[in-house]
């Protein structure tokens, strides 16, 4: 089944060209099926690029998915036009009465700030609490994952001496996990962050389980056993050129930055990088969507009633 998004969303044509099945509102009405309701709380500056990355993974599922784009109400985006936001986004205040089968919270380029200094931290806390009653399963990514695991479990973040930046080998620590179905024993994942969470802090909670880890970059994916929450601290959703874009952005701005590790062929920035993580990104999101489908109530309004 395809993903349902507005046919004027910039990601629509790109997804069609990539072979992802998408549908319009008219097409969706003709299908006698309840689509999975997935919300995307997009905290990234380049919202259009992030929309495409997430829609690409969610839309690859054989299930019909309706993707709702959501933004923080009290924060003005600097890198996305107001016209785009008004056309395609709702604020959390506008959707907080709804129920969602799945909810994605993205990263944000604010990881060096203490959580309490983030201008929208209060609203972020309200959203995280709201997911407990209005969302069946949540996928938290990068800063979104750090914020969520801090909010729910008090797991702190630690500033790194230098940016963790590149493509790193990771280990599958729980091959029997429903979220790692089909995963290799080891695989590569893009990393781009200035902070980290640590295994010792996570292991203090009996309800958290580490599923992916790197000997160089530490914890990558954590599963909350009872809360149906995933914490992904790296960027499986990244495009082939995402790290390259970040690298050249900083180089052009005169910001000190090391070349991303294990990324450019022969460490030559003039050569196009190869995507070596795409298949596992699709596996992770496909497994997540499938688990939602298997466990969410048929009546979306019953979500949260089992708590």
Curated annotation (Swiss-Prot):
What the protein does comes down to:
Transfers an acetyl group from acetyl-CoA to L-homoserine, forming acetyl-L-homoserine.
UniProt cross-references to NCBIfam families, sorted A to Z: metA
Enumerate the UniProt keywords alphabetically: Acyltransferase, Amino-acid biosynthesis, Cytoplasm, Methionine biosynthesis, Transferase
Q: State the top-level EC class.
A: transferase
Q: Name one GO molecular function term.
A: homoserine O-succinyltransferase activity
* Species this protein is from: Rhizobium etli (strain CIAT 652)
- Identification of the protein by name: Homoserine O-acetyltransferase
Q: Which GO terms describe its biological process?
A: L-methionine biosynthetic process from homoserine via O-succinyl-L-homoserine and cystathionine
List the pathway annotation.
Amino-acid biosynthesis; L-methionine biosynthesis via de novo pathway; O-acetyl-L-homoserine from L-homoserine: step 1/1
């Amino acid at each position: 089944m395809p993903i349902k998004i507005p046919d004027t969303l910039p990601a629509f044509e790109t997804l069609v060209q990539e072979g992802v099945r998408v549908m319009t509102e008219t097409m969706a009405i003709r299908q006698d099926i309840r689509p999975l309701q997935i919300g995307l709380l997009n905290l990234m500056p380049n919202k259009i690029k992030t929309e495409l990355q997430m829609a690409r993974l969610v839309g690859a599922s054989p299930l019909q998915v309706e993707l709702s784009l959501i933004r923080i109400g009290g924060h003005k985006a600097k890198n996305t036009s107001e016209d785009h936001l008004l056309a395609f986004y709702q604020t959390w205040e506008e959707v907080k009465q709804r129920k969602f089968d799945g909810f994605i919270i993205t990263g944000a380029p604010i990881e060096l700030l203490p959580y309490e200094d983030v201008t929208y931290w209060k609203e972020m806390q309200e959203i995280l609490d709201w997911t407990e009653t209005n969302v069946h399963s949540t996928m938290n990514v990068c800063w979104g994952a750090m914020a969520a695991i801090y909010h729910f479990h008090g797991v702190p973040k630690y500033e790194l001496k230098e940016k963790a930046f590149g493509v790193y080998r990771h280990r599958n620590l729980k091959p029997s996990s429903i979220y790692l179905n089909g995963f290799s024993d080891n695989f590569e994942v893009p990393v781009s962050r200035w902070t980290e969470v640590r295994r010792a802090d996570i292991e203090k909670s009996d309800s958290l389980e580490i599923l992916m880890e790197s000997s160089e970059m530490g914890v990558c994916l954590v599963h909350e056993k009872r809360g149906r929450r995933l914490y992904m601290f790296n960027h499986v959703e990244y495009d082939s050129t995402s790290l390259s874009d970040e690298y050249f952005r900083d180089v052009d701005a005169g910001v000190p930055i090391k070349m991303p590790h294990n990324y450019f062929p022969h460490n030559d920035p003039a050569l196009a990088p190869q995507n070596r993580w795409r298949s596992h990104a699709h596996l992770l999101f496909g497994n997540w969507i499938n688990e939602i489908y298997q466990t969410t109530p048929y009546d979306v309004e019953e979500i949260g009633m089992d708590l």
